[in-house]
């Protein structure tokens, strides 16, 4: 089928030449018909011979020229076309030289843009690291505040700033995540409680409590830093979209896997939005007045879950709440996946 496609493309490219030959043949037949001194049979013989030779010439040209375009279609680099002398005609050689020049320029442009992006990401990472120092110092100053209501208000805003800085830091590290992972056995309860501690100021200001149901012996084989980030994004969303309610967190063993379930009683997600919740920058279509949503939390979760081999399932009903499940792999599954990537 591929050869047939190329043959029809070749015929279309030669259609005017073929029509010109047919036109000349009709002219010759017309002259022979009008001039009795010229034998029609002789003209027919010449025409048939000419058509036969033309067909052979077309086949030869097709085999010679289409080979070059097939190589282009197979995405062979122009350097290979030049070095292997696959461009037979002067026109093909000019085309290869043009493509070579364009691709060289594009590669140089892409390299320059990559360097700019890496430079920007490095500068942004340095900025976040640098600003974390005064932010940490700010918390120490806030802790000394005597007015409790003022202290809680300041800690609430501090938590938001710290969360945004951490999220930005993780975003800049996404590209290098493979180089920034260390798998180990970690108590799941410890991971969750550490993240609850980080969000406690915002939770307290919104009247949100936590209901924990854990088995103390449940450990997961994962990367602590990136797994905590995933839990934090889900907890952050649960707190952000809830008021005066409870967040229920439980962990259990199902089959050979540990399952972490985080359930809130917040605004929930509409059914039409569920397929898009992992898209970067996507925020709810049912709550367009909310200006604090960044649309980055679940985007981060979606990227990281593949690297950690964690299955994430989300069920939600509008105005009823959301349930997020993390299904952790066992150690053998992680080792097998890492072995495939070596």
From Swiss-Prot:
Membrane topology annotation: Multi-pass membrane protein
GO MF terms listed in the record are: ATP binding; phosphoprotein phosphatase activity; phosphorelay sensor kinase activity
Segments traversing the membrane? 15-35, 43-63
Q: Which reaction does it catalyse?
A: ATP + protein L-histidine = ADP + protein N-phospho-L-histidine
Biological processes, Gene Ontology terms? cellular response to phosphate starvation; response to antibiotic
Could you tell me which SMART domains the record lists for this protein? HATPase_c
Source organism's superkingdom?
Answer: Bacteria
- State the SUPFAM superfamilies in the record: ATPase domain of HSP90 chaperone/DNA topoisomerase II/histidine kinase, Homodimeric domain of signal transducing histidine kinase
Q: Give EC number(s), comma-separated.
A: 2.7.13.3
Modification after translation, per record: Autophosphorylated.
Q: Where is the signal peptide?
A: none
Q: Which UniProt keywords apply?
A: Antibiotic resistance, ATP-binding, Cell membrane, Kinase, Membrane, Nucleotide-binding, Phosphoprotein, Transferase, Transmembrane, Transmembrane helix, Two-component regulatory system, Virulence
Might you report a single GO cellular component term? plasma membrane
Q: Which InterPro entries match?
A: 2-comp_sensor_kinase, HATPase_C_sf, His_kinase_dom, HisK_dim/P_sf, Sig_transdc_His_kin-like_C
The top EC class, named as a word, is transferase
Residue ranges occupied by any Histidine kinase domain in the UniProt entry: 126-332
Q: Determine if Hydrolase is one of this entry's keywords.
A: no
- Where is this chain's protein located in or outside the cell? Cell membrane
Residue numbers carrying Phosphohistidine? 129
State the protein's purpose. Answer: Member of the two-component regulatory system GraR/GraS involved in resistance against cationic antimicrobial peptides (CAMPs). GraS probably functions as a sensor protein kinase which is autophosphorylated at a histidine residue and transfers its phosphate group to GraR.
Q: Which PANTHER family match?
A: HISTIDINE KINASE, PHOSPHATE REGULON SENSOR PROTEIN PHOR
> What is the protein's name according to its record?
Sensor histidine kinase GraS
Q: Which organism is it from?
A: Staphylococcus saprophyticus subsp. saprophyticus (strain ATCC 15305 / DSM 20229 / NCIMB 8711 / NCTC 7292 / S-41)
């Amino acid at each position: 089928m591929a050869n047939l496609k190329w043959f029809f493309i070749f015929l279309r490219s030669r259609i005017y030449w073929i029509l010109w030959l047919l036109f000349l043949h009709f002219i010759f037949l017309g002259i022979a018909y009008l001039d009795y001194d010229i034998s029609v049979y002789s003209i027919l013989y010449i025409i048939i011979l000419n058509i036969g030779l033309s067909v052979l010439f077309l086949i030869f040209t097709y085999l010679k020229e289409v080979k070059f375009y097939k190589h282009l279609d197979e995405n062979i680099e122009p350097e290979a076309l030049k070095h292997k002398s696959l461009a037979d005609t002067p026109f093909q050689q000019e085309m290869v030289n043009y493509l070579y020049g364009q691709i060289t320029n594009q590669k140089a442009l892409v390299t320059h843009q990559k360097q700019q992006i890496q430079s920007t990401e490095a500068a942004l990472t340095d900025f976040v690291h640098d600003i974390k120092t005064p932010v940490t110092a700010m918390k120490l100053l806030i802790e000394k505040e005597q007015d409790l209501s003022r202290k809680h208000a300041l800690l609430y805003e501090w938590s938001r700033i710290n969360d945004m800085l951490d999220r930005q830091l993780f975003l800049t590290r996404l590209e290098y995540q493979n180089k920034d992972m260390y798998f180990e056995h970690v108590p799941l309860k410890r991971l969750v409680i550490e993240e609850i501690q980080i969000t406690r100021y915002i939770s307290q200001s919104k009247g949100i409590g936590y209901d924990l149901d854990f088995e103390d012996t449940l450990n997961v084989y994962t990367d602590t830093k990136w797994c905590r980030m995933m839990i934090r994004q889900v907890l952050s969303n649960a707190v952000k979209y809830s008021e005066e309610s409870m967040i229920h967190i439980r962990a259990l063993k199902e089959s050979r896997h540990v399952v972490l379930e985080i359930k809130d009683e917040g605004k929930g997600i509409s059914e039409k939005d569920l397929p898009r919740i992992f898209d970067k920058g996507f925020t709810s279509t049912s709550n367009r007045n909310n200006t604090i949503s960044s649309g980055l939390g679940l985007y981060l979760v979606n990227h990281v879950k593949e690297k950690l081999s964690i299955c994430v399932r989300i069920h939600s009903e509008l105005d009823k709440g959301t349930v997020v499940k993390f299904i952790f792999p066992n150690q053998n599954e992680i080792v097998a996946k890492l072995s495939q990537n070596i």
